[in-house]
């Protein structure tokens, strides 16, 4: 495991659950992939390896979903309801895929004596593959460059005939059909990019601007996420927190 590897090599390694909203409910299950019940050992291992979780990024928000939080008027904020990488785009089941629901699942597992594998801190991330992040909806340039770098590729405006011909050439080359949709007599790319958004940022309360100090902040879960706004927020919460700690 990562924890054993870290102990042996004295190298800091951590995993950060990514795009849980597109996991079809598999990210925060109440049993293992083998169908075994979650155990205290599993919960402890997951918390050692995964102290924080990504709650927002370009492929949607992983906070909550209208089906999970029907009384929350913001529950539909930047929802991507498709499974990551599915072709054609396929619905992703929300139960087990969103962080707020994972918190409740973790508390239930802990109450049952099986430990809490979902006691996460929060981060955001851009998930861009361009070496830069686009955090302003009014100045969004792309996530992966060649695939969504122009408005036609994202399905924001109709495809021109030249673009359709180019896509068909790629389809023939890679033996993969081009996914398009007809709206009011116009042809649009149907790639699921219309549910992407300009987001997000990870914020860490670190003692200094060094990699080690930032990683230690992740380990302490002294982090929060924004959808792109650069703000400084600090708050304190904990099971055993007292005034002397503050």
Residue ranges and their predicted role:
Residues 14-243:
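A post-motif C-terminal structural segment
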Residues 2-8, 12, 244-245:
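Single conserved hydrophobic/aromatic residue that forms the stacking wall/gate
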